Amino acid sequence: MISVVIPLYNKEKQIAYTLQSVFEQTFQDFEIVVVDDGSTDNSVEKVEKFDDSRIRLIHQTNAGVSAARNRGIEEARGELIAFLDADDEWMPEYLATQYGLYQKYPECSVYACNYEFRDSEGKVTPTIIRKLPFEGEDGVLSNYFEVASCSHPPICSISIMVKKTAIQAIGGFPLGIKSGEDLLTWARLAVNEKFAYSRKVLSVFIETKSDMNISKAQMRAGSEGQVLVELLLLYDREKNHVLKSQLKKYIIRWYKIYAVIQIEIGQGHKAIKIAYKAMVFGGTVKSFFPILILGMLPNKLSRILFL
């Protein structure tokens, strides 16, 4: 049995569509663990309208998405856990494909597929995934960090299934990080476990219209900084030279993300400091030169040019 874990917080308009996409799976041996993280809208009522014994609704006071996912992991009865966010969807073959990877690659503990973005008007944007280490439809993703350093993230929070023992071994999802907590979790799994991956696009990340205002960007800046610190700790502990080299490229990309966000919120001087740290770590002057230039411009001008 696969345990589908869905963290839920104020998604009354989307949760029914999300649950329906699970019930429409061709693979039907699953349970759904919905963890309500203190919703204040009608999300819970929407879930309760589904008359199916495979749904378990767990309530907790608001503690954030990582805490909700961790509670779902704890409550899960299956050996395999598939994560799905309360405002996204799966295509009908999703769980069957993931279970197929589980059967085909017994040496792996993490299973993932490709995904796509869909906006509120139905426009679909595909991901760009480069340097997969296999030619066929699926295979072992032996170079996760290399792929992640030059592509969209090959794995997202709605396109992954993992053995319960593997996610518990790394302590679940990190608490206190509000953005990028999922990517840090995949990184921690990547240094400990083997990944199986399918090129099939079977998960739909639904984008809502929301402008990136300064307060949201500031929150991301803090979170991205926390993730970067944790990635550097992984790098310092890693003994495998090949994996360490790939992780280094991934960290340099995070330095760039962190610096760009600083420019977004008008902190050009911080962006310059981050760029210098990245170049000391191994980033090239060429790749960070635009950030250095933007960081030296007046805040208003740099934001206009950047955005």
Spans of model-derived segments:
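Cell-envelope/extracellular polymer assembly enzymes that use nucleotide-activated donors
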Residues: 1-3, 21, 31, 184
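Short, well-formed alpha-helical segments that are part of the catalytic scaffolds
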Residues: 11-24
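A conserved acidic beta->alpha catalytic loop
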Residues: 21, 28, 36-45, 61-63, ...
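Glycine-rich, basic loop-to-helix element that forms the pyrophosphate-binding segment
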Residues: 60-76, 97
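Flexible acidic/His/Gly-enriched loops in nucleotide-sugar-dependent glycosyltransferase catalytic domains
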Residues: 65, 95-101, 107-166, 170
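Conserved nucleotide-sugar donor-binding catalytic segment
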Residues: 74, 134-225
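Short aromatic/hydrophobic "clamp" motif used to bind/position activated sugar donors
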Residues: 81
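C-terminal subregions of glycosyltransferases and related glycan-biosynthesis enzymes
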Residues: 207-307
